[in-house]
Amino acid sequence: MNIYITNENHRLTDVIVGNSFSFKSNINFRDLYDPISLFYYLRGKFPNKYKLQNQISNFKKVLIKYGVKIHDLDIINTNQIFARDLGFIIENKFFISSILPDRENEIKGLKSVLKKIKNVIKLPKDAHIEGGDVVLDDDNIFIGYYGRKDYKNQITARTNKKA
């Protein structure tokens, strides 16, 4: 697979899409580390596996309609449905994110996709970053990060300055 991205506003040709086949709708709230998930759980609106599967299927249909090639994540035993956090591309390099320890297992979902890419870079363990915190705009790379000393205590701060 040839990859090359310098600007996220360019036409989308390929995309990695997650799935919800192993999604657990009946989850204990203590297993939720993400405040948004907890917010919806406490209001009785935590996502339903089958509704998510339908939404992802419809999303794929729209992408295909516009000629976008879809690469699916491997099915692993997590509540992972989005691929954006797992990595990002700068030019022809795929960077594997160094994500929260509670989510490290999600990286396994990229296994089949990564086999098709030549230039894969795994960041050091102490350089925490998620793909959603990186935005490319031609010659500029924007990275949102949390720089305070209490970083280790923040579960919503997922990118640090070292990244």
PLM regions with names:
Residues 1-163:
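The feature marks the mature, well-folded catalytic cores of soluble enzymes
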